Amino acid sequence: CDLLSPGGLGVISFIDRHATLVHATRQLILWKACYLSGVEDVQSEDCLNLAHTLYDDDFASIAASRPFDAWWKDALISPWTNNHLWTYQEIIPIIEEAGCEFYGSSPKWAKVDSFDWYKNLHTSSERHHSLLESWGSAFPYFMTGMPPSGQKNPLPSLEVLRSVVDFVGDISNYTSPEVSAAEVPEYPAALHQYFNQCEDTSINKFNSDMKMLYDAARGDSLDNLLATYRSCKVFRGTWGAHYHYVCFVKSD
């Protein structure tokens, strides 16, 4: 922000700690499949073949700009840690403290200025408070990548948010740095209950798929894990909304 002149725009990108769950789940499923298959090296051809078995059809359904093998290297087997992830709750206060104000984002999810008369001028603090409230309403979208259906979904409690952060951290530990016999973390009860309370039936089905996937991943049958993944049609069509650009403007 110090590099900007008043009225100047800055842009940052980040991976959202909550919204990375779908991506992290695909990585965990591959890690567990490798363990059950006796594949010790995730950089190996055997791991790549397992990834093709699991994810070929899913990957073919999206408008990808890179081949499957490149996605496997970048998204599935590259090491990552929870420490490198961020949230809007962390970033927005930093932007405000630096004398800047939220301007826009991609994906465009914030409703901070929607249906507001242009003469209603708000302070940066007021807009940022409204922005973070809007984030809670968009939480199911962040987690699944599925656009809002117009049906009512509850706001996530602090318990739900903490359960997601802890869960993502546990997955990060499980998939770093190598395949091991460590126990797969259990799908959080608080998150399971939250998704079940959503009125959107697609969110409910996504939730059921997630619960089945983690139950299967905590077992010791490769065939059951592969069959369960194939049956999870809603999850397989989701990719989360984990990668974000934020634009901010330097205050006068």
Regions found by a protein language model. Give the residues of each.
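A short glycine-rich, Lys/Arg-flanked "PGG" loop and its adjoining helix->strand segment in the class I
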Residues: 1-9
